[in-house]
Amino acid sequence: MLGEPRAFCRGTLRRAAWRRRLRGVRALLNRCVVFSHGKDAEPWGSKIVALAERARERGYSVESVDYRGIDSVEARLDKLLAACAALPAAPVLVGSSLGAFLAAAASRRVAASRLFLMAPAVDLPGLPTLPEMAACPTTVVHGWRDEVVPVEKGIALARAQRATLHVVNDDHRLHASLPRIVQWFDECLR
């Protein structure tokens, strides 16, 4: 008689463990990174290609929103929100320059799981005020020699969000720092 309850418990525990593993696998399959490129950049520029490769290595699916031909910040934001609405889970949002502004602006509305912002174009003339961002792990990378977005803007954003901040000896495009940026992005995905 004592053997029967144990057998039942063992079977129940095995099924529960299997369900937990299955949920974990589903969560892994649903992980997605959405890239948001800058004003004059392309959806598959060198930074995005390098970061997308690392995301795929980590088991993430990858999307890159194409804003070419769209000048309005609001229309770009709508396109990013629409891309995120189709996702099965909260995305990691990655952006560069204006794309970083868009990622930050969309983060709360799409419940982003993480933000990775490079040379974020925030608090600049002609741009709307940045809405409240998601309370999620955030990394900001900015170049000391940024000729488009003053480094102080990135520092202020990182301070306000209590984000991880990396300031590098680079310009707005951050190409010379790409190997380190890929490493920091890898840390962000863990």
Task: Describe these PLM feature segments.
Residues 28-69:
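Short, surface-exposed "cap/lid" segments of acyl-processing enzymes
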Residues 159-173:
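Catalytic histidine neighborhood in serine/cysteine hydrolases
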Residues 94-103:
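Gly/Ala-rich beta-loop-alpha elbow adjacent to hydrolase catalytic centers
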